[in-house]
Amino acid sequence: DKRLDADISPKPTIFLPSVAETNLHKTGTYLCLLEKFFPDVIRVYWKEKNGNTILDSQEGDTLKTKGTYMKFSWLTVPERAMGKEHSCIVKHENNKGGADQEIFFPSIKKVATTCWQDKNDVLQFQFTSTSAYYTYLLLLLKSVIYLAIISFSLLRRTSVCGNEKKS
């Protein structure tokens, strides 16, 4: 009952591991969310980039949402494999061109070292963001006080000048 011209192939959204997860647990979890596909029959598996071995992964149930379906799958990568790139392969009858959809995920170590050179960088970034927020609030408060003073001065001047008799 789907329109023939509608694109009902799986639409992927990817989520990469957090810096906290990779630093604290020495693992990283890639998440692939597939949405707005029809019919519900779909196969998802994971491989290392340019590899042939299917990796152990988990997936949620296929859920129906507004006439289409969604599913998510995730791969938890141990520390020894964080330097490798991975891909999520999606088999679905409505994939464009009839080929399997391959979604690439970058190396966790490459992303982590690119983002934060040092563990203190995260704290520095948080401190900088918080400082910027409070500076903005302070400037906003200053502007509101300045507006009140100028408005009061203008109103007072108008009332004083308005009572004078004109000749």
UniProtKB/Swiss-Prot annotation:
Keywords: Immunoglobulin domain, Membrane, Receptor, Transmembrane, Transmembrane helix. The keyword Cell wall biogenesis/degradation does not apply. It comes from the Eukaryota. It is found in: Membrane. Pfam families: C1-set (PF07654). Its main location: membrane. It is a single-pass membrane protein. The keyword Transmembrane applies. Residues 156-167 are cytoplasmic. The chain crosses the membrane at residues 135-155. GO terms for cellular component: external side of plasma membrane. Residues 1-134 are annotated as: C region. This mRNA was isolated from a cytotoxic T-lymphocyte. The gene corresponding to this mRNA is rearranged specifically in T-cells and its organization is similar to an Ig gene, with V (or V+D), J, and C regions. This is T-cell receptor gamma chain C region C10.5. It comes from Mus musculus (Mouse).
